[in-house]
Amino acid sequence: MKSWSTRPLPQLPGNIEAPQLFDSASKTLRALPVAADASLYVCGITPYDATHMGHAATYLAFDLLGRVWRDSGASVNYVQNVTDIDDPLLERADRDGVDWRELAESQIELFRADMTALNVIAPQQYIGAIEAIQWIVPAVEELIAEGFAYRMDSGDVYFDTVAASVKTPDSSNAGELGAWWLGQISGLSPEEMLPVFAERGGDPERDGKRNPLDPLLWRVERAGEPAWPGASLGDGRPGWHIECTVIARKFLPAPFSVQGGGSDLLFPHHEMGDGHAWALDHTPLAKHYAHAGMVGLDGEKMSKSRGNLVLVSALRAEGVDPMAVRLSILANHYRSDWSWTAELLERSKLRLAQWRAAMEHTSVGSAAQLVSEIRTALAADLDAPTALNAVDNWVGQKATTEHSALDAALASDAIEALLGVVL
């Protein structure tokens, strides 16, 4: 599946040093090793209402991470999936009386356009769940053979969370992930997990399961539903969590550097994905788990189910500059929960205009300090609000020399390369 186009990244003098990123599994701020190669997996959309501001905030958060890595001199291998077959997609298509394939393709294309407009660096691999079925089927068969999965009387296949859990005394030392057990990534107790699991696509009360928290691996064909060849599994379609695990294992090292997504994916999605990976090859899925906060509207979480969405495409259709939208998102720390407001957008429009105007009266020698301050802020857990304030302070300084086109160019390049804002 094609991704989207990416602007060439401006090259800056020097490099960012010692970036740190909060790890959701250890609940600590951890250093990101500055290596020649970095690997990132960010869970993608289910294409039936793209792209709302919550989506955009997540992908901008990890776009910042990719920019920080690249500024450190690393080569970034970035993979993102698309859940192009799932119950919510089928339900929306049925509700609207459209073919689910057409709905998915239209929303994926809209998402691509939104990401291009927001200047989000495209993944090297953009993989649909349907495309990945050819790799998912043998993985599920292997889990059954190893005793980590089981068939229901219906033919559906589930992951056995109890069989796969192996807790060792020192497996979580210093935030390092070792053998998997349920709760290792999220830190939740089984009692805390149950309502969250039910809310986020799980079926804890289904009769015949060995354990209430066992997630679906393979759903056998039902009348009126699409299905694909599943070899010994029978025709059907994959469960949600196994899709990302298999795609990540196909295109990234084991374990890869950072698993990213919204905070609502911490459990069950990332918890179960890591369990699948451990059961398949006794290696953690990722070294580091990072999660973006939730975005609300008028004090409520923005979500498709609630219908309280602010869509990037709708703002673009109204003529809003996508860079003002990007600045609105970056004004909030990526891990914080925040609300979209009209006032926030208006402040961002003004900020963007002021930044652009400042490029016409830039003092000689002023840009190097700005570059340093942006780098320092982003190295500290992607602190975009502090980076934006650094630019504001630089913009607010009165020019003390004749205009320097070189400094203006360096400042503009830094703002684009590090913050993704095109002036």
Curated annotation (Swiss-Prot):
Keyword Metal-binding in annotation: yes
Cofactor descriptive note: Binds 1 zinc ion per subunit.
Residue ranges of coiled coil: none
Gene Ontology cellular component list: cytosol
Enzyme class: ligase
Motif annotated as 'ERGGDP' region, chain positions: 199-204
Keyword ATP-binding: yes
Keywords assigned by UniProt, alphabetized: ATP-binding, Ligase, Metal-binding, Nucleotide-binding, Zinc
Cofactor(s), names only, from the UniProt record: Zn(2+)
Motif ('HIGH' region): 45-55
Binding-site residues for Zn(2+), renumbered to this chain: C43, C244, H269
Binding site for L-cysteinyl-5'-AMP: C43, G44, I45, T46, T58, N81, V82, T83, W240, G262, S263, D264, V295
GO biological process, one term: cysteinyl-tRNA aminoacylation
Motif 'KMSKS' region location, chain numbering: 301-305
MF GO annotations: ATP binding; cysteine-glucosaminylinositol ligase activity; cysteine-tRNA ligase activity; zinc ion binding
Stated role: Catalyzes the ATP-dependent condensation of GlcN-Ins and L-cysteine to form L-Cys-GlcN-Ins.
Stated name of the protein: L-cysteine:1D-myo-inositol 2-amino-2-deoxy-alpha-D-glucopyranoside ligase
Gene transcribed to yield this protein: mshC
